[in-house]
């Protein structure tokens, strides 16, 4: 795969940044695509651009604000609380988001001559989001290939990793500190360790602490 081109679906968070670093070791040429869907915080867009610039990677920014009209949710609306209720999808779930993102990433890949598309979705710590499942990604891969008559390959390096294992991968890529300090996972728009209170921050911290304990125990 070293002599091929890839597109990374990129938000500037822990997962997509780890995927970008993985892709840079796997492919000759890598570009990123970031989607603006009226997220609560402009910081996500700024962080994605800053990380891409630091890594010397081209960043495409696409306007997906229509998503907010179709599917109001806690990631885009200040008047919707971020909460998780047992037996229900979290209020941060955006219906169809990954379907739209992967479709548009495939269109971009078509235009720039890339065959590989990388996304940081995973089924292990997926908060119940149905569009983070392996079954969905494989189905989407077949669909975009049929739609464009191209042999795209959608890669999911984190699909079967939990958060601790994702930190381990970042460490193996010699980028543990970079991912910890430069990325934005927090739903409240705070870089690095975040607010420590939202579900994303708690999951990230739990994974980091678990990995560091495993590392120190060796």
From Swiss-Prot:
Subunit annotation: Homodimer.
Pathway: Purine metabolism; 7-cyano-7-deazaguanine biosynthesis
Residue numbers binding ATP: 10-20
Cofactor note: Binds 1 zinc ion per subunit.
NCBIfam families: 7-cyano-7-deazaguanine synthase QueC
InterPro entries cross-referenced by the UniProt entry: QueC, Rossmann-like_a/b/a_fold
Positions contributing to Zn(2+) binding: 186, 195, 198, 201
A GO MF label: ATP binding
Keyword ATP-binding attached: yes
Keywords, sorted A to Z: ATP-binding, Ligase, Metal-binding, Nucleotide-binding, Queuosine biosynthesis, Zinc
Enzyme Commission number(s): 6.3.4.20
Record's protein name: 7-cyano-7-deazaguanine synthase
Catalytic activity reported: 7-carboxy-7-deazaguanine + NH4(+) + ATP = 7-cyano-7-deazaguanine + ADP + phosphate + H2O + H(+)
UniProt record, GO biological process: queuosine biosynthetic process
Keyword Metal-binding: yes
